[in-house]
Amino acid sequence: PLSNLDAALRVQTRIEIAKLHSQLTATMIYVTHDQVEAMTLADRIVVLNNGVIEQVGTPIELYNSPKNQFVAEFIGSPKMNIIDLEGEQKSSLINIQAPNQSAKIGIRPEHFRVASNGSSKLQGTVRHIENLGEHLLCYINLGKDYEITAKLDVSSEINISEVIQLDWQKNHEHFFNSSGISIN
């Protein structure tokens, strides 16, 4: 598996496999547990969960329109944040109109942004920050068992233990029913 290679060699090997695929113009089946390999090498991906096909599609179809929570969390790095929208948690965590049934909302880390007071949909305490140069990966506790990851602009002035307000880009949320099936 490519995961046994160091990062630079792994990227170079993926490029070589992609070139070979293009040159041969042949159908190739590549089996991997690494979603980055799947996203970068495949024209179409079959996502399996315990031997059951969850979804088939292009990398961008799976990323933008996951059919269920399993695919939503599997495709993308860092993975999609999933928040329950029921009862007290629904009213205390999020201020949006959600379906009348028990549901979950999924938001990808890159769709979050720091919000001004009053316009936020979420509030949480920053537990850890990874500065990756081009962006910050912020690990934010929303209370109880809810922790999310937000990929924020590196110019954001955020500190560990700070309580911050978050919003997300409109139309980038995904809703799932209590069984994990997309209800968008």
Segments from the language model and where they lie:
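Residues located in well-ordered beta-strands
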Residues: 58, 70, 84-86, 123-127
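Non-catalytic connector elements of ABC transporters
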Residues: 78, 89-184
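Glycine-centered loop/turn positions within well-structured domains
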Residues: 36, 60, 69, 80-81, ...
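Short glycine/serine/threonine-biased micro-segments
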Residues: 49, 55, 74, 104, ...
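ABC ATPase nucleotide-binding domains
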Residues: 1-70
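C-terminal boundary and immediately downstream tail of ABC-type ATPase nucleotide-binding domains
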Residues: 64-88
